[in-house]
Amino acid sequence: MMKLDTVIAGGRVIDPSTGIDECTDIGILEGKISEIGDLSKREAASYFDATETLVLPGMIDTHGHIYQHVTGKFGLDPDLVGVHSGVTTVIDQGGPSCMTIGGFRHYLYEKSKTRTLCFISAYLVGGLEGHLYPDLYGPCGVNPEHTIRVARENLDIVKGVKAHAEIGGQSRWGIEVIRTGKEIAKAVDLPLYIHLGQLWPTKDSAEIPDADELIEKLVPLMDPGDMLAHPFTRHPGGFVNQRGDVHPILLEAVHNNGVRVDVGHGSHFSFDVARRVLDAGVVPFTLGADMHGYNVSVPSEEDDEARKSNPFLGVAPFNLTIAMSELLHLGVDLKSVISMVTENPAKVLKMEDELGSLKLGRKADISLLKMENGRFTLTDNSGGKETCEKLLMPAGCFKDGNFFEANSPLVPEKIVA
């Protein structure tokens, strides 16, 4: 019998794609999962003690901003968001565009330890400084023909199209750009991913558009498989209407028309809104962290005035596992939360035959988490504080069979209540 490269021993293995949830061992050989079961008598080059550790399919963060330097301070180091945070795959949401996808391929996809994919921006400038300059994102800032061509040429890394539906843009150019984004997505048979919640100031503060009306215009454009982001946003124009209820048209889209929901946590998350949306029966399909340079603290960077005044600034500490912990705290069961970062994102990417599972023969992409018990403080960016009793923290990951420690400075310190 061939000697294994690595045995991950004694962890609680949870894989929603196969239904497994038990304490067992995983064997890795030549970068792939070769065995699952009692491997205590198997010879291996290395052993990883996973006692009291959750062993999951490699986690997939469906909403990252990792096009470092090209998108200014907005883009983070992909490996600090990825493998060194226990995450094996990160999807950059709208950072690269038809003009900058080549750089994304060369500097991220080909060189990062983390698997880096993207939803290409519908806009020519991509995610420049996190869309800080609204005038760059109007009808004159899109070129559907060019974006369609470039997306088709890069389908190995382009897995969707990113656009925005929010009242700042609506006040300037209506929903024309959203229609163009849908045109691009449909032409390349990829999902359209729509940001909800106000980003930009309205053009004329005396004539604030009706955020509820925008939702009514948006939803008919969405097809099964398209995605709505930020269901728990504290900003106007999200899932909750001006009366404080979840939009009926959004409930219909999610429950009956196959539209998917991504958490897109970021600095948008509100406990109050999250409870309203979850109580209405909307359970997100995927859980993207939405970390970027203005909502996490990077110790090596100066906390300058420009950063502090940025409209996308967030102060509540979070990462993917904190976002997972918040959903657990709000009553979503562990298996469903794990599905949101494993098998479900793999389906979004149309890569369920490669990612999101611990099936034998798959790439050895494996995330390791610690479930800590106690009393911990969770904070949102509206100032809300809640106490949870279970906190998920990254312990590391294996990517293609290689181990990475969860030593990213972006991993928040736990706050004991």
Which residues fall in each region the model found?
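Histidine-rich, glycine-flanked metal-binding segment
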Residues: M1-P57
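Divalent metal-coordination and catalytic microenvironments
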Residues: G11, I26, G31, E52, ...
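C-terminal cap of metal-dependent C-N hydrolases
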Residues: G11, K363-I415
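Metal-associated gating/positioning segment near the N- to mid-region
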Residues: K41-R42, A50-K111
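Active-site mouth loops of central-metabolism enzymes
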Residues: T62-K73, H131-E145, G169, D204-E207
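Metal-cofactor-binding active-site regions of metalloenzymes
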Residues: S85-I91, G95-P96, K111-P139, K162-G169
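Histidine/acidic residue-rich metal-binding segments in metalloenzymes
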Residues: G103, V142-V261, G266-F285
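His/Asp/Glu-enriched, well-ordered alpha-helical/loop segment
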Residues: R275-M371
